[in-house]
Amino acid sequence: MLFRIDFEMGIYPDRVQVADRRSGRFVDFKSEIPFSAQGRLIADPLYFEYALVKAIRKVMSGGFILLDAKVKVLPTAPALRQSERDAVVNALRNIGFKAIRFESDHPSPVAA
């Protein structure tokens, strides 16, 4: 059976947490290559995307389809700068997510 992807994601210094909202599976992944720097949560978007892909692969089990893949990004402390938000959106779109919602925003998702 194939399932649509519906994830929740938290971003921390050099760490990504991903939860599958359907199954309840949760992964807390410490990045092998640091993507944060002093005062910046996402200093290196490429290493952030690499960590995110590895975390997502660990949380997935069973069959998934990327049709209408959704992700909710939890608020961060400190709040993401616009360049960091753009890095998150770009990474998630590169992975295949279509609906990206930042919980700190209005309820409408970022459409593809």
Language model region names:
Residues 1-16, 21-112:
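Nucleotide/phosphate-binding catalytic cleft detector across ATP-hydrolyzing
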